């Protein structure tokens, strides 16, 4: 009776294991990405719930930026983002308590707040950058300049001006409010520049890297939160006129899309 294993048999077994691993690895990676994408979607749902809670209490949405400070503008302007204002309405009262709203967002008294991560604002698919904290992967939609170059403050979140739900005349269901904006230059949840105009398609490879645009690390699309609170994964192939229509709050456009 032969009790040993020949070298050939061992190599065959190793080869089979390698083939199985190669076949299973993509499936495992895909399953992990699906879980991360689901978490990203849940993050935006929490943001949507916070916006509705904010509106229920104050009868208005937050402004996109409170006391907007233009580039090289007066340093006394506070420049706080909508994403800082809604913190108490998404169970982040402790982080909200770190913010001194009597001083500008980048005042030394707000250093700790600026360095504090808020888990809901971080998409798990986006690689963490060592030394970067207080970031957000979601930006408010200031408007679109896909179909127009004038009056581009046609979105839900603009400088200094808060809107009520009734001001979103295209309907809450049909108006995007917040979208993934990974890797943008103004990606801090406290920074009032966390709003942007969309000028191209989703994950547009032609978009300048230093522009804030709808971008994600997901395959083939990005998560978008609509004003009603629902979230959609919108494909890179979304038509530009459709994307423009879903961003405007009062454009009176008709559009349909397969999510």
Show the residue positions of the predicted features:
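N-terminal single-pass transmembrane signal-anchor helix
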Residues: 2-36, 46
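Surface-exposed loop/linker segments characteristic of extracytoplasmic
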Residues: 19, 23, 34-259
